[in-house]
Amino acid sequence: MEESTITIGRLAKRTGVAASALRFYEARGLIHSVGEAGKTRRYRRDAIRRVSFIRVAQAMGMSLQDIGAALADLPSQRTPTADDWARISQAWKPLLQERIDALCRLRDQLDSCIGCGCLSLERCKLYNPDDKAGEQGCGPRFLLDEKA
């Protein structure tokens, strides 16, 4: 194949992402291969920057769904530019702030709730009579959701 493409193994090595994860990203439409030479998937070189973009966004706590929505606005044969990143990051700032706020609430409650040993069912936020929190969905609602 031409030199403008790289194998999945080379893409994995260049980005630090396992080949299985790259296939997962491709199945989700986040990256696109341009064919196969033998039985090896090949990618355009711009896939290196797209995968790097995905890794940075994941490190920020963005879901693959959010990342996919952002990348969907870009042509598949182009990497995000500085202007693209500025636009995307502006859209993500409120989501990131929500996560920061939730983590701060959790941090502030750690000393008083987890392992406190108070055994006070009247004031303990972890107490859940009749499993009322179950109506709100799965997970530790009292610690992660201020509305609980």
From Swiss-Prot:
DNA-binding span(s): 8-34
UniProt-recorded Gene Ontology molecular function terms: 2 iron, 2 sulfur cluster binding; DNA binding; DNA-binding transcription factor activity; metal ion binding
Keyword annotations from UniProtKB, A to Z: 2Fe-2S, DNA-binding, Iron, Iron-sulfur, Metal-binding, Transcription, Transcription regulation
One GO BP: response to oxidative stress
Binding-site positions, [2Fe-2S] cluster: C113, C116, C118, C124
CDD domains per the UniProt record, alphabetical: HTH_SoxR (cd01110)
Domain HTH merR-type intervals: 5-73
Pfam families: MerR, MerR-DNA-bind
Keyword Transcription regulation: yes
InterPro entries documented for this protein: DNA-bd_dom_put_sf, MerR-type_HTH_dom, MerR_fam, Redox-sen_tscrpt-act_SoxR, Tscrpt_reg_MerR_DNA-bd
Stated name of the protein: HTH-type transcriptional activator SoxR homolog
Gene name per UniProt: soxR
